[in-house]
Amino acid sequence: MISMLRCTFFFVSVILITSYFVTPTMSIKCNRKRHVIKPHICRKICGKNG
C-alpha cells in the first residue's frame, strides 16, 4: 500500500514538473512564430493560451 502511494505520488509529480517546464516553452515558441506563421495554426499548436 505504501509503495503504491509512493509510486502514484512520484508519477503525479513528474507530470506536474514536466507540464510546468513545457508550457512556458511552448508559449515562448508560439510568440516567436506568431509573426511568421498564421495565428490560427499557432492557436492549434499552443491551445487557447497562445
UniProtKB/Swiss-Prot annotation:
Q: N6-formyllysine modification sites? A: 29, 44, 48
Post-translational modification Asparagine amide, affected residues? 49
**Keyword Cell membrane assigned:** no
Keyword Magnesium listed? The answer is no
Q: Which GO terms describe its molecular function?
A: potassium channel regulator activity; toxin activity
Annotated signal sequence is 1-27
Predominant place of localization: secreted
This entry carries the following GO cellular component terms, namely: extracellular region
User: What is its subcellular localisation?
Assistant: Secreted
Listed A to Z, the keywords are: Amidation, Disulfide bond, Formylation, Ion channel impairing toxin, Mast cell degranulation, Neurotoxin, Potassium channel impairing toxin, Secreted, Signal, Toxin
Q: Which domain of life is it from?
A: Eukaryota
Question: Which tissues is it found in, per the record?
Answer: Expressed by the venom gland.
**Coiled coil stretches, renumbered:** none
Q: List the disulfide bonds.
A: 30-42
Say what the protein does: Potent anti-inflammatory agent. At low concentrations, mediates the degranulation of mast cells thus evoking an inflammatory response. Also acts as a neurotoxin capable of blocking a class of voltage-gated potassium channels.
Q: What is the protein name for this chain? A: Mast cell degranulating peptide
